[in-house]
């Protein structure tokens, strides 16, 4: 625990008086405590308990375009990695304005970010836009990117991330051009660019180099580090799942071969990230084909025969399959269209 307190000097007695609150009083139960001056990054914080690890870069408004850049998100692992990180670090609904919260939670995507909501709040806030939702999604996105960079740079999570480390990560992942110009100038130690209301024609310098172009020029010959996500890959390297064809499999020579179920968790994880096939909302667990001779006791259809459905339509299908297919089309048709799309965009190759 770290505490930020305002001291009261008593020079006549050579004493210093501190007044901690209820939450911070327990730090003085230790035999000794460490006292150090207030850092510049904490001057605007109120007195009281300070977070164990505070990230000043997360509060830097000039870095918001960098954290929300699509290339930066892909370099950090993609939206799927963001969802996994949220599920590991957030155990309850993040929406503070609800009067009721369900115990089950889901990932609610908003813009380039995401948040953890319970089923009730997810239904209430779906298709809604507000500054509170945008701020919450941006905070989660920023915290995730900073956590990824800290782990890639030093492997430890118990330290503050510096601007130099963030810039180096951007260089290694070939996204340095996503850094705002003001941030690039700070990284190079250049003075802040002065914006005047009126310029003279003689002040215009043609072909003046920007800080971003200087960074790109100086780092163009650097090879990406092993942990860096490559930005330029061949279509084969971008595929989620590759299917191997074996025209002489042992079962193909048997009269009554034992059925082997095709399992591909990587593909079903990708299906889970796709929009619902009925309404376009974020999907829940992928639905495996039922009926049509598929599935059975202790087994289910191949992982290839899956369909992204939200929780509402997933429950609707299992409640009344006939009514669902009358309303949205047969499962075979929906799955065929989805497989056709997966093949067309290179996910299955």
Curated annotation (Swiss-Prot):
UniProt-listed InterPro entries: DUF968, HNH_nuc
SMART domains: HNHc
Protein name: Uncharacterized protein YdfU
Upper classification of the organism: Bacteria, Pseudomonadati, Pseudomonadota, Gammaproteobacteria, Enterobacterales
């Amino acid at each position: 625990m770290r505490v930020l307190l305002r001291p009261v000097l008593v020079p006549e007695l050579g004493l210093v008086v501190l007044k901690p609150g209820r939450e911070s009083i327990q730090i003085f139960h230790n035999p000794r405590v460490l006292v150090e001056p207030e850092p510049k990054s904490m001057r605007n914080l109120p007195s009281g308990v300070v977070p164990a690890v505070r990230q000043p870069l997360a509060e830097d408004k000039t870095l918001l375009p960098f954290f929300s850049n699509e290339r930066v998100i892909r370099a950090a692992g993609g939206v799927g990695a963001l969802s996994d990180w949220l599920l590991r670090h957030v155990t309850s609904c993040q929406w503070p304005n609800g009067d009721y919260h369900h115990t089950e939670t889901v990932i609610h995507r908003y813009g380039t970010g995401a948040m953890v909501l319970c089923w009730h709040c997810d239904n209430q806030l779906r298709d809604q836009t507000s500054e509170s939702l945008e701020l919450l999604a941006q905070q989660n996105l920023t915290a995730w990117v900073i956590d990824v960079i800290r782990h890639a740079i030093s492997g430890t999570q118990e330290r503050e991330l510096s601007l130099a480390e963030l810039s180096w990560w951007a260089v290694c992942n070939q996204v340095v051009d996503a850094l705002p110009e003001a941030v690039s100038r700070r990284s190079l130690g250049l003075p802040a660019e002065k914006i005047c209301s009126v310029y003279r024609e003689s002040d215009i310098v043609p072909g003046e180099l920007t800080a971003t172009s200087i960074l790109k020029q100086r780092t163009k010959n650097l090879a990406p580090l092993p942990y860096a996500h490559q930005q330029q890959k061949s279509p084969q390297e971008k595929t989620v799942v590759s299917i191997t064809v074996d025209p002489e499999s042992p079962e193909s020579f048997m009269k009554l071969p034992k059925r082997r179920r095709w399992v591909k968790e990587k593909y079903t994880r990708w299906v889970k990230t796709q929009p619902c096939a009925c309404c376009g909302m974020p999907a829940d667990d992928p639905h495996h084909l039922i009926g049509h001779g598929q599935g059975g006791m202790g087994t289910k259809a191949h992982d290839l025969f899956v369909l992204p459905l939200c929780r509402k339509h997933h429950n609707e299908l299992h409640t009344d399959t006939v009514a669902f297919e009358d309303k949205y089309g047969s499962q075979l048709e929906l799955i065929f269209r989805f497989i056709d799309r997966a093949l067309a965009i290179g996910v299955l190759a």
